[in-house]
Amino acid sequence: MPGSGTSTFIDPDDYQASLDRVPLDLLLVTSRGEFKASVTSARLNHLYLLRSEEDFPRVAYISLSPALVFVGFPGRSSPPIVWGGVELHPGEIVLHSSAERFHQRTAGPCSWGLIGLASAQFERYSKTLTGKALTAPAAGRVLWPAARNSARLLRLFTQACRLAQTRPKILGHPEVARGLEQGIIHALMTCLRSTRVKCNGPATQDRQQILMRFEDVLADRLGGLLRMSELCALTGVNERTLRSCCAEFLGISPSRYVLLRRLKQAHTALRDGDRATVSVGEIARACGFTELGRFARAYQTVFGETPLTTLRRPPGSGPTSPIFTDPA
């Protein structure tokens, strides 16, 4: 059943949780200040549309649903967005692989969009409109369609999102939803049919796989002692390579990324914890911190308050200071 909606967020965790079809396994905001983002989504018959507008630089680790074929792109006037280590400029699009995992990094206020189409429908429409049944590629591709084709796709996408934001009920009418959907699908297939592939090169794909192994190691070992030498060994690369990949994809060093992931994990546990049954020390140790004084100082630097203050605060209240990083 067609549906749509728009929401505004001042808390990074709430924003992260709202992207149900685009699971953000991790969202680290990389600037001080009051976080603000808005999300507009439209669910038509076979299409899922999402437009996000964000005020602050951040890095996200994203896992796409295998049920849909996704195409992503920056907004018309958005600064470059780094998708999987590659700068994406207005007019370019990403055709994602099935269930793709990747990092997305922004350097400032930006907007970006995502179109999801059920795999079977993607194959059927592509065969009808291009003469060739297309499927999600084995690896994500950055494409460079003709300017008029990408402009048409963005215009129709923006039109649908504007209706979802200002007149959401109208998208509940089957004829309106069907007309918008057909126009967007046709524009999308035109972009995919007549396009140039932006050369990423196998080296970029290899480096992306290094980052995925890095994330797998962190998912398994984040709560334990993890020295740089061990992290490199488990990832299967030397320290120089890991540092280079993290700088390219994440914009920060591996050690800084690990610290911020642990602090975010601790922040979530403290925010949701019951102070009658859990202590700051227990949470800190569970998140891999062995020196409580150093943990408390790092936590306060990032979140603007002590860990105990977060634990004592009633759920849903208090400041929403985002995580920030320095270039270390």
Question: For each predicted feature, which ranges?
Answer:
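N-terminal low-complexity or simple alpha-helical regulatory segments
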Residues: 1-67, 72-73
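Alpha-helical bundle regulatory/interaction domains
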Residues: 1-34, 80-222, 227-229, 233-239, ...
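Glycine-rich active-site/cofactor-binding loop and its immediate structural neighborhood
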Residues: 61-91
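Generic hydrophobic, amphipathic alpha-helix propensity
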Residues: 210-214, 258-263
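C-terminal structural cap/anchor segments
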Residues: 237, 247, 256-259
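Short hydrophobic/aromatic patch on the recognition helix
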Residues: 242, 246, 294-295, 299
